[in-house]
């Protein structure tokens, strides 16, 4: 079962990715993790990636695709894999297809921008433990304080409204066109495209995923 997750930052992909990995026994492939692992291992591709990153440049699509191919050939991907955060653009999706990396399901988590902003800017984190709260959806017992230690909670830089809105603009410009791309791929019978209402509760989304993936 080879799956691509699509959806804006804050659409709930991370939570559901965890569920899919555990339920279906397939690993999540993150291009960031893959790049770090290749650099650390000092593989041929890792050396190339390191040279590009050290020069302050973005790693090319070709190199990322080569890393994905190398990664999915490993034993733990025998039953499939879950791609989140890649492909981000239509050229990357085309390159994946040309490299013979086929996908069974493309799952789009659809959530309106304003709800995403609401979800993200309300997050509060306890730095010591990583415990996450939300001022509206999961508030601490005492406002601004961690339930366990009573220490102050903080807002991550990434969770500030200006940053969130920037990331959403980037998503709509770069990644949203993939929705049309994979819709056409599904019509051609090359994959199954499923749009999931990400505004539902975590459990409802989970039930829908089980229904789709079997």
From Swiss-Prot:
GO terms for molecular function: adenylate kinase activity; ATP binding. Disulfide bonds: none annotated. Pathway: Purine metabolism; AMP biosynthesis via salvage pathway; AMP from ADP: step 1/1. ATP binds at residues 10-15, 123, 132-133, 200. Catalyzes the reversible transfer of the terminal phosphate group between ATP and AMP. Plays an important role in cellular energy homeostasis and in adenine nucleotide metabolism. Consists of three domains, a large central CORE domain and two small peripheral domains, NMPbind and LID, which undergo movements during catalysis. The LID domain closes over the site of phosphoryl transfer upon ATP binding. Assembling and dissambling the active center during each catalytic cycle provides an effective means to prevent ATP hydrolysis. Belongs to the adenylate kinase family. Monomer. This is Adenylate kinase. It comes from Edwardsiella ictaluri (strain 93-146). The lineage of its organism: Bacteria, Pseudomonadati, Pseudomonadota, Gammaproteobacteria, Enterobacterales.
């Amino acid at each position: 079962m080879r799956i691509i997750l699509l959806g804006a930052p804050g659409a709930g992909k991370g939570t559901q990715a965890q569920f899919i990995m555990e339920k279906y026994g397939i690993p999540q492939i993150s291009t960031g993790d893959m790049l770090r692992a290749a650099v650390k291992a000092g593989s041929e591709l890792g050396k190339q990636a390191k040279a590009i990153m050290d020069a302050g440049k973005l790693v090319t699509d070709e190199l990322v695709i080569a890393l994905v191919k190398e990664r999915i050939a490993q034993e733990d991907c025998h039953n499939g894999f879950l791609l989140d955060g890649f492909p981000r653009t239509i050229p990357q999706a085309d390159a994946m297809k040309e490299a013979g990396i086929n996908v069974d399901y493309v799952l789009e988590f659809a959530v309106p921008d304003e709800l995403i902003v609401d979800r993200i800017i309300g997050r509060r984190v306890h730095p010591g433990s990583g415990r996450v709260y939300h001022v509206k959806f999961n508030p601490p017992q005492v406002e601004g304080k961690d339930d366990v230690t009573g220490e102050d909670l903080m807002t991550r830089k990434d969770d500030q409204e200006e940053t969130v809105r920037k990331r959403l603009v980037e998503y709509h410009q770069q990644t949203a066109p993939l929705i049309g791309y994979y819709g056409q791929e599904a019509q051609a019978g090359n994959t199954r495209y499923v749009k999931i209402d990400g505004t539902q509760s975590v459990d409802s989304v989970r039930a829908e995923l089980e229904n789709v993936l079997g």
